[in-house]
């Protein structure tokens, strides 16, 4: 299983057979690897939900952490492509000056990757942010490109972080202006861009922005110039590179760009690979822990989750068998609904309909036989003929 996280499934099968004489099928390796990955996704989702719900005290952090995030495309089935988002967190080491340049390195880099949208990525990544103690770290910087979802991610996790626009990304914008001014690939364009990048790195963005504003006035029809000027003006505070270097911060997002290649593309973007969408996150979860050198720490959680899922399946199957043995309830005959009359009933004759209904006691008529029947005392009294 662990081999299949590092290499394609069939290569893992061949390695086990050739090196260890262990015979397993590719289907078995695929099934077990995906099950382990899905279990770890469930573990991390539960942890993230608990952190968001209970807001536990943050773990102790480092003196100086840097965070960087980016996206990488992976191939899905049916010719589709989807963006995997990755967050990388590392400890910043003291800057070292080499050949008149400050060199800043990071260590203990860890990763969190998911195939989700930006709004889902923010709370899900809490699990790694909390584990690294980002909230309690004394200093935190976020080196990103200028995408809005990245700035939202920084605001979500550490709003007071020092925000640094990736230097290569800023240089790309300036290079586009040079290509538009002097022609794509011309020596003049390359020379102009190189001079401005050196100026940006060692002097900051102020003079460059002034020059770009003047160029826009001279070339009002040049859309690429107007677009990139607006982009850079909005992020002027994130391009104070001389100050950032003096503070010992990295000014490039190479940490996460390497993560895109190492964590994501090396395993999910190989020749001929096309993934089911539901299988991407399980593999990413396992890639995160092997590339962060945390397999030994996290594997017990995976085993525990797999056991929990197996018990739940057994209980569910047992309950289904119990319900299947129960006698079926006796069928209750259905009463057919009464059919509505196709025609309304005929009206009663007027004299019948209007005949008042009698209520209360009624006296017998004068000639009723009961009038002449002896009842009560009259029964014992002599008749008139007898008295006469």
Regions found by a protein language model. Give the residues of each.
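Catalytic center-proximal scaffold of phosphoryl-transfer enzymes
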Residues: 1-388
